[in-house]
UniProtKB/Swiss-Prot annotation:
Family: Belongs to the DTD family.
Name of the featured protein: D-aminoacyl-tRNA deacylase
EC number(s) reported in the record: 3.1.1.96
Lineage, broadest ranks: Bacteria, Bacillati, Chloroflexota, Chloroflexia, Chloroflexales
Gene (name only): dtd
Gly-cisPro motif, important for rejection of L-amino acids, short sequence motif: residues: 137-138
Stored Gene3D superfamilies: D-tyrosyl-tRNA(Tyr) deacylase (3.50.80.10)
Organism: Roseiflexus sp. (strain RS-1)
């Protein structure tokens, strides 16, 4: 499971002419579900995201989390995070989970954020969406649940 986490002052997602999700200060989370991902990974990634200290404290240091600031989250499914561009010029998405697996896991991720106390808005799974955001920083972090299982580099 992969997430591109962007700190924002506001963000919204529109399908057609309808705004289906909007937030103020918080995180825009583009979430990709991979083949073999599970509910456990969705919960782990949600917990990591909610507690990631990427908001500034009074001294300007990254010491506050989404939970600490009472921020919101906008979760947008994004299968293209699993693009394989090693061959040719057209990306392959064979590592992305099929919709019948991915959609429920996106719901588990969003549900876990809510359980942790985060106000969550979402995009619409499988729809063509327009995402608007105002980056704050900018701060953009890539999270990959596969990396959480590996030991940290000793360099």
């Amino acid at each position: 499971m992969r997430a591109v986490v962007q700190r924002v002052s506001q963000a919204s997602v529109t399908v057609g002419d309808e705004v289906v999700g909007a937030i103020g200060q918080g995180l825009l989370i583009l979430l990709g579900i991979g083949v073999g991902d599970s509910e456990a990974e969705a919960r782990l990634l949600a917990e990591k995201t909610a507690n990631l200290r990427i908001f500034a404290d009074e001294e300007g240091r990254f010491n506050r989390s989404l939970l600490d600031i009472g921020g919101e989250a906008l979760v947008v499914s994004q299968f293209t995070l699993y693009a394989d561009t090693r061959r040719g010029r057209r990306p392959s998405f064979s590592d992305a989970a099929p919709p019948e697996i991915a959609a429920p896991l996106v719901d588990v991720f969003a549900g876990e954020l809510r359980r942790l106390g985060v106000a969550v808005s979402t995009g619409r799974f499988g729809a063509m969406m327009r995402v608007a955001l105002v980056n704050d920083g900018p701060v953009t972090i890539l999270l990959d649940s596969a990396i959480f299982r590996e030991p940290r580099n000793q360099h």
